[in-house]
């Protein structure tokens, strides 16, 4: 099993959810592109080993995974929002947050990986996304702040922070292929965020 990323899709020119065959543009001259390009290369290496040596390989492409298992060093926006909410702080956003994302609770992601591993077709890739949790970054932050009764604030980002941003305006994934294998998400976004904040707070 190879765990890839939704970032391999790049920027596509059409609207709608990303299917497993929707590959868009990635700027090769952006240092930020080292991540999605390396993931694409690793996927190709997997299927090359399948062809050359008959390796049984399945690829999964998780969306934005969140949950109480995040570390203090996790710098992703969703992790920062959950951390700030668990400390009952106002949540600070460094952008308008209008980018659309596929969120999925870490426990749902774990079951999705097992389903793909045990039932998936060799050489195929499967998106991991809860179709009930496709929202903007701002909407995710709003749920976090409202759950703990704090404010959502906005600040201008530094140039260094901007350089690390995922440039995909939409990375909403279609999980139909995975669902056809019998998987479905069990955590809706509100309850998943609430559970995550409560668990993180227990460790503080």
Task: Locate each region found by the language model.
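Active-site helix of classical SDR
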Residues: 34, 38-41
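Conserved Rossmann-fold NAD(P)-dependent oxidoreductase catalytic core, especially the SDR/UDP-sugar
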Residues: 1-32
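Conserved loop-to-helix N-cap of the C-terminal "lid" that shapes the substrate pocket in Rossmann-like
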Residues: 59, 74-79, 97, 102-110, ...
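Glycine/proline-rich active-site loop of Rossmann-fold NAD(P)-dependent oxidoreductases
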Residues: 40, 66-80, 89, 94, ...
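Mid/C-terminal beta-alpha module of Rossmann-like enzyme folds, strongest
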Residues: 119-162
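Conserved C-terminal active-site "lid" loop/helix of NAD(P)H-dependent oxidoreductases
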Residues: 106, 125, 138-139, 161-185, ...
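Amphipathic terminal alpha-helices
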Residues: 189-204
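Conserved beta-loop-beta element that borders a ligand/cofactor-binding pocket
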Residues: 4-5, 43-68
């Amino acid at each position: 099993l190879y765990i890839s990323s939704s970032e391999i899709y790049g920027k596509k020119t059409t609207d709608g959810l990303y299917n497993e065959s929707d590959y868009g543009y990635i700027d090769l001259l952006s240092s930020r592109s080292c991540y999605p390009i390396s993931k694409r290369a690793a996927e190709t290496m997997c299927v090359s080993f399948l062809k050359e040596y008959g390796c049984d390989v399945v690829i999964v492409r998780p969306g934005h995974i969140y949950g109480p298992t995040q570390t203090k060093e996790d710098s992703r926006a969703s992790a920062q929002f959950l951390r700030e909410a668990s400390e009952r702080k106002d949540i600070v956003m460094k952008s308008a947050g209008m980018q659309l994302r596929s969120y999925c609770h870490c426990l749902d992601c774990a079951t999705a990986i097992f389903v793909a591993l045990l039932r998936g077709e060799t050489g195929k890739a499967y998106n991991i996304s809860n179709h009930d949790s496709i929202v903007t970054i701002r909407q995710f932050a709003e749920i976090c702040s409202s759950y703990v009764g704090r404010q959502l604030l906005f600040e201008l980002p530094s140039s260094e922070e901007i350089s690390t941003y995922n440039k995909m305006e939409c990375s909403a994934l279609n999980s139909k292929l995975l669902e056809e294998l019998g998987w479905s998400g069990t955590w809706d976004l509100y309850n998943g965020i609430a559970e995550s904040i409560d668990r993180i707070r227990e460790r503080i």
